[in-house]
Each structure stands twice: as C-alpha cells, then as structure tokens.
Amino acid sequence: MSFDQLNVIETGGGIAGPLVGRALRDLGANVVKLESRRRLDFGRTRVPPPGKTSEHVHASPSVHDLHAGKASVTVNLKTELGRTIFVDMTSKADVYVDTYAPGWLERIGLSYESFQERNPQLIILSQSAYGTMGPKRDQRAYAPIMTALAGLESTVGYQDGRTVSQVSSAVGDLV
C-alpha cells in the first residue's frame, strides 16, 4: 500500500503525536486530527506569534506547522456519540496515533482488543512518557521531566554553575 492510500486517525497532543501525523501526511497519507473542544491540544496555545497572547487559540506557529494538511474534527470521547464517531473512524483507518496515558481509552470503554476486533489490520501507535508496560507506565510526564531524567538538564547553563530553567525545546518529542 502506498502512503496516499493510508488513512490515519490522530488524537496525539503537544508535539509527539502531531509530529507523527505530520510526517505521515508529508508522505502522502490522509490524516484526520481528532481533539476535544473542551480540552484542545495544548500545542495550540504554545508560543503565540508576536503581538498575540496565549488566548489566541490556533495562533501558535508550531501548530500551523504540525497540523498542516490534516483534516480536523472535534469529538468528545467522554460521550456515547463521541465514542461512536471515534470507533467508526478507527474501524476504517489504517493507522491510529495517540499520546494518551496508558489505560485512558480502557477507562472510557475502549481497548486494544476492541480496536483489533473491528479492524484487525489497524496499526496502533500509542506514545506515552514511560510506555505501556513497566513500573512507571501510569505516571505522566512532559518534556521538562523527561529531559531531567535523561540528564539533559545538566547540559544547559553557564560555566560558573548557574543554570537556565530547562532545555529549550521538547527534544523528547522530536526523537
């Protein structure tokens, strides 16, 4: 199958999920970005352009870059209608990308097995901070936490020992 025949559903937030969706879109895939109207992708208010404030939803240049070429649909997965729409869309998709914490989909009545029953060919890419297995799987984390744990925070600062607040980019989302 060529990329232009690939249908992707993306619910990933921040940078990691949208970056995967953007890469697949750049290769020709049809990507649909799903997000809640009540809890927008937090990347939408990240670093607004000059003269704008974080209240200018969608103003972030990175959001324009990461969401370029994607269709966008708002769905509330906490409602029956929202879950029905989501299940219908993933039943017809080739790839599903999310950045939910492990167990979140199960808590709203969806599971890996339910995806596979409806669509055995569906490729699921679930990106959480600590993975879906292991002792820290239920812990949430964002770039500053992960860069500190990886030791990257020790690489920024000044020769006299003063530090800066954090590594300046979400490097963990980009690798």
Question: Where in the sequence are the language-model features?
Answer:
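N-terminal helix-loop segment corresponding to the beta1-alpha1 unit
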Residues: 1-175
